From Swiss-Prot:
Pfam families: 2OG-FeII_Oxy, DIOX_N. It comes from Amycolatopsis lactamdurans (Nocardia lactamdurans). Pathway: Antibiotic biosynthesis; cephalosporin C biosynthesis. Belongs to the iron/ascorbate-dependent oxidoreductase family. This is Deacetoxycephalosporin C synthase.
Length: 314
């Protein structure tokens, strides 16, 4: 019988070496789990970073938003407007846009609309970074993976924090018209930590593929959601799964009250991380780079350009 549940682990227990067999099985077969005991901010701290961003989405002027849109096409920084991106385009699964808007920051080249915004996000970023490094260490160590540069150097990297706001969908984006708010994809990260807020009407929008079927992954109080990314798969030589996931659209009967947010922290390697292109393809990743080896910058830079080109041309 297929087990389609997403398990929950406690970080303190994993540090003590408990539940390792179950954890390795989860990493190999699912690549997704809830995690408690991370030491991440309490809900009020998550809310401070989230609410200041959503307030900017709702009340920032067009000029203010334009001022914090990055001119660099190969990175994600600052504001990205509603339907300005298309995950479907870069995954070759359609032409529809992501029905969301977002704000992103990294370790450099950031754009902030105010000093208050900057302070809230820098504090939040630092806490999420520390937690994601701890989680990644447990994930890689559990399967015996050792990065070529050493664990500490590998995890001293180039992460990205992105707050996505999914407003209520309009009538032409309900599930009967377009089933997804965001297309299926795997993450280009080592691990991804997600703190999501539920839809007010109870609809579960985030779903992950388990054994060929998509299952709901609702917000779980007191826990973050962890996706293992494609980089973890490569470092572990296939011993860790990078699961596909998508964001489903509500049906017409669930349209009202379907807004939600997702605070997503991508622990990504440094841009010079090098990998085998043929091995990446063997692991199921769509890498079109015409070379035997490539860097992470090669891989992700093209994705960022393509995600914007299509949306702008829609």
């Amino acid at each position: 019988m297929t087990d389609a549940t997403v398990p929950t682990f406690d970080l303190a227990e994993l540090r003590e070496g408990l539940h390792q067999e179950e954890f390795r099985h989860c990493l190999r077969e699912k690549g997704v789990f809830y995690l408690k005991g991370t030491g991440l901010p309490a809900e009020a701290d998550h809310a401070s970073g989230r609410e200041i961003a959503v307030d900017f989405f709702d009340h920032g002027t067009e000029a203010e938003k334009k001022a914090v849109m990055t001119p660099i096409p190969t990175i994600r920084r600052g504001y990205a407007g509603l339907e300005s991106e298309s995950t479907a385009q870069i995954t070759n699964t359609g032409k529809y846009t992501d029905y969301s808007m977002s704000y992103s920051m990294g370790t450099a080249d950031n754009l902030f609309p105010s000093a208050e915004f900057e302070k809230a996000w820098e504090d939040y970023f630092a806490r999420m970074y520390r937690a994601s490094q701890d989680v990644a260490r447990q994930v890689l160590t559990s399967v015996g993976a050792e990065p070529e540069v050493g664990m500490d150097a590998f995890l001293d990297c180039e992460p990205l924090l992105r707050l996505r706001y999914f407003p209520e969908v309009p009538e032409d984006r309900v599930a009967e018209e377009q089933p997804l708010r965001m297309a299926p994809h795997y993450d280009l990260s080592i691990v991804t930590l997600i703190h999501q807020t539920p839809c007010a009407n109870g609809f579960v929008s985030l779903q992950v593929e388990v054994d060929g079927s998509y299952v709901d992954i609702p917000a779980q109080p007191g826990a973050v959601l962890v996706f293992c990314g494609a980089v973890a798969t490569l470092v572990a030589d296939g011993a860790i799964k990078a699961p596909k996931h998508h964001v489903a659209a509500p049906g017409a009967d669930k349209r009202v009250g379907s807004s939600r947010t997702s605070s997503v922290f991508f622990l990504r390697p440094n841009g010079d991380f090098r990998f085998s292109v043929p091995r990446a393809r063997e692991c199921g990743f769509d890498v079109s780079i015409p070379a035997e080896t490539a860097t992470f910058d090669d891989w992700i830079g093209g994705n960022y350009i393509n995600i914007r080109k299509t949306a702008a041309a829609r």
